């Protein structure tokens, strides 16, 4: 489920590290988290949508890899992002 342009822009503005940042690890994790939450709501309504469930698991794996990379860059950046997004680390 793609995100609309206004939602993407809000996420970028909140999580960017400088004025032209659109692809940093923080922004990517924030966008994946938003997509995961939307898809989780969809799957609660449609329990037998197995292709969407597989896509959800792929997104969760990608977010986990990005979070591991962010942790290797610095524990403080990792913990700030986890707290800001409200996800488990």
Swiss-Prot record:
Keywords per UniProt: Organellar chromatophore, Plastid, Ribonucleoprotein, Ribosomal protein
GO MF terms held by the record: structural constituent of ribosome
Entry-linked InterPro entries: Ribosomal_uS15, Ribosomal_uS15_bac-type, uS15_NS1_RNA-bd_sf
Main location: plastid
Any matching Pfam family: Ribosomal_S15
Keyword Ribonucleoprotein: yes
Cellular compartments annotated: Plastid, Organellar chromatophore
Leader peptide range in chain numbering: none
Record's GO cellular component terms: cytosolic small ribosomal subunit; organellar chromatophore; plastid
Key word Ribosomal protein present: yes
Annotated GO biological process: translation
HAMAP family: Ribosomal_uS15_B
Protein family membership: Belongs to the universal ribosomal protein uS15 family.
Subunit structure and binding partners: Part of the 30S ribosomal subunit.
Name of the featured protein: Small ribosomal subunit protein uS15c
Organism for this UniProt entry: Paulinella chromatophora
Phylogenetic placement of the source organism: Eukaryota, Sar, Rhizaria, Cercozoa, Imbricatea
């Amino acid at each position: 489920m793609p995100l609309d342009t206004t939602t993407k822009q809000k996420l970028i503005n909140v999580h960017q590290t400088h004025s032209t940042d659109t692809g940093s690890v923080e922004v990517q994790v924030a966008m994946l988290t938003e997509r995961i939450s939307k898809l989780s709501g969809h799957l609660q309504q449609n329990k037998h949508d197995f292709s969407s469930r597989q896509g959800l698991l792929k997104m969760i794996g990608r977010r986990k890899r990005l979070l591991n990379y962010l942790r290797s860059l610095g524990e403080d950046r990792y913990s700030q992002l986890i707290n800001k997004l409200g996800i488990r680390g």
